[in-house]
Amino acid sequence: MTMKALVIASLALLSSCSVSAAETDLIKQGEYLARAGDCVACHTAKGGKPFAGGLPMETPIGVIYSTNITPDKTGLGDYSFEDFDKAVRHGVVKNGSTLYPAMPYPSYARVSDSDMQALYAYFMKGVEPVAQANKDSDIPWPLSMRWPLAAWRWMFAPTVEEHPAQVAADPVISRGAYLVEGLGHCGACHTPRALTMQEKALSAADGAAFLSGSAPLEGWIAKSLRGDHKDGLGSWSEEQLVQFLKTGRSDRSAVFGGMSDVVVHSMQYMSQDDLTAIARYLKSLPAVDPKDQPHQYDKQVADALWKGDDSKPGASVYIDNCAACHRTDGHGYTRVFPALAGNPVLQTADATSLINIVLNGGTLPATHTAPSTFTMPAFAWRLSDQEVADVVSFVRGSWGNKGAPVTASDVADLRKSDMRTTSGDDLGQVTQKH
């Protein structure tokens, strides 16, 4: 081989290695972004293979099933980048059908072109193909017809050009806005929806409805993430928020419901810089209630319980079933059993989540940085509807909390609801598995 040929061959080899390394980096970036978007949580059925779809999702008109997004021909195998982009950011699949808005493409419209390229590289070259056909929805005809979804998309979903990332004076807040309003699609759960099921706001610029809390879905409500002290994040520090997102627990609260999946599949893998950006952005959101005030601890109930006075409705149920972990003063045990005093979850206008936890229990998920799990047992088998209502009302109105009381009929409605039949033990197993 001549020297000239050797040089040419060496340059070609170096070029090949460079392309391969660049592609590997792009796939790795796409994997991180897929984590940020928590794609696996919706596109993986219980006991199924990652991203193969088939997870049932309750909607007001029936059950739909998530789709296969692996690079198999039954999934994304024949999707070009343009096809992929049209589905993710525009809500239109390869055959021209509009996706159900359970796919948060109105939020994904904010994802940048470069991040879309990385996501495509990951799903096409970094995900194991799984041959699994998509399942049809259980929505009855004529509600199952897709053409109304196209009209919905036209009326309510922003175009990519109309929905650019917000830019703030603080670049950390700008990054947080991009993650929360875009890939993180936090508003899909934490923003209320109109009768026509669109989110009432897609960004902070759209008004105070953004991230102000949702209506009940599958037995839970997604609480407000705005600056209110009573039922939002006003009393949380930036550091506490980062800790909560990374571990599922903090000095102030513990994760439950669908947010457990978010922590397990997504948030624990985010970089410290990105978690800080998310927390700082959320802390920048003002309160909804201009008269909102910080929680003022009231020790009257704690003193009464300490003296053995359980005359207040719900007090005896609390002493017998709750005080050992959450204490008579309502302060709980840091990062083990959450405090009830001043806890925003106890003071939301809708007590569905709290009733659900009492009935069905729950388990803190294990994460890389907080591997220990703690379980609250289910009390549905032990307490009557009236006893649950009494103890829920008791904790919502004690230690300075300002939550309204609930009734036995509120408990009965949730108990017999077919949306949440999982026992406390089953919930723990599901959470652990994911």
Where are these regions (language model features)?
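C-type cytochrome heme c attachment motif
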Residues: 32-44, 67, 83-90, 101, ...
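Bacterial N-terminal signal peptides
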Residues: 8-16
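C-terminal soluble interaction/assembly domains
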Residues: 347-348, 372
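Flexible coil segments in periplasmic/lumen-exposed cytochrome c-class electron-transfer proteins
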Residues: 23-26, 44-64, 94-101, 105-177, ...
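Sec/Tat signal peptide C-region and signal peptidase I cleavage site
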Residues: 17-22
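The feature marks the first
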Residues: 38-44, 55-110, 114-115, 219-249, ...
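Bacterial N-terminal signal peptides that target proteins for export
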Residues: 1-7
